[in-house]
Amino acid sequence: MFDFSSVDLLDAFTRELRLCKVTEGEHVVVLSEPASRGDYVAAAFGAAKALGAHVIAATVPGGSPAPLPSTHTGAGPGLRSVLADTTAQDLLKSADLVVDLTQEGFIHAPVQQEILRAGTRILFVCDAPDVLVRNLPDEGDKQRVLRGVELLKSSRTMRVTSAVGTDLTVQLAGSRPEFQTGFADDPGRWDHWPSTMVLCWPELSDGRIVLAEGDILLPFKEYVQSPVTLHIAGGRIEKAEGGAEARLLETFFADADDEWGRHLSHMGWGLMRSADWFATAMYGKGDLMGMDARAFAGNFLWSTGPHPVLGRESYAHLDIAMRGCTVSVDGTEVVTGGELVER
């Protein structure tokens, strides 16, 4: 019996690599581990070849130094087999584009920054097939997120409020605004398919965050069942109050025994209008990274743990996606009551 599973993905991967500006004669490395999806490897390989690139499929041993299960959490440092192998690193540095199909990627690994400094573009892909296809980005998405980045760069404070009691003030000085747009088209750029979001890395934030029923805790991939109030001072979660999810978070911080586990890291808002908030409920936890929740248009996304701008390395990484918030940047609302505002 023939395996045709990659055929349906070939068109999507080809369109995606075009957005990544893969051209004839470029060198593309498709990076995988034994647990990676074979149909993704085949589709990425075929797409790169169809666009005239030189393509190599490189499979390295699995295994991560992260204490958490390294399966689509967004918290891992990458694979030991790459972190400890300069030959593998040199291969990635020599490529024009790396299509990273590993389970966890190298999002929080210093070696990724070395690869990017070599001019390599990196595209990380790991969500389920229909999630990728439904959220295939558009070239115009880049201008949308860049407008948000420019607003953050020119502003001093971001305020987040909600009807259930969130009231957080964020100092934007030195917060290094960034974006994800779902494709890696510039030399030295990392991006994630799918994703469309604006984010920054502030140091100081004060107030309270109130999680409402239906907000999403990642990487647990669980919906909040009862309200949780988080008291924030100087960018640190001082206390979590509420029901089962509050106890879950307090236990997570205690068990992590991590210096930076309670500290906030990146935060921002989603612009991916094709995202499905209910995807988290419809798939197995091992099938999703959870980008529908992270990049959902009009969400407020914030996180804990690793903070590269401040030099904080941490495995205690949470992403929490909230709906129903109003996000204003120096008085300009970019999200109103959970609805994305685009001018």
Task: For each feature predicted by the language model, list its residue ranges.
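Internal helix-turn-beta structural module
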Residues: 286-341
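Short N-terminal helix-initiation segments at or just after the protein's N-terminus
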Residues: 40, 100-103, 168-180, 208-210, ...
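Active-site bordering "gate/hinge" segments
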Residues: 1-225, 233, 258, 325-343
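Dual-mode signal for accessory low-complexity, basic/Gly-rich regions
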Residues: 223, 239-305
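Short conserved micro-motifs at the rims of enzyme active sites and ligand-binding pockets
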Residues: 221-222, 278-281, 312-315, 339
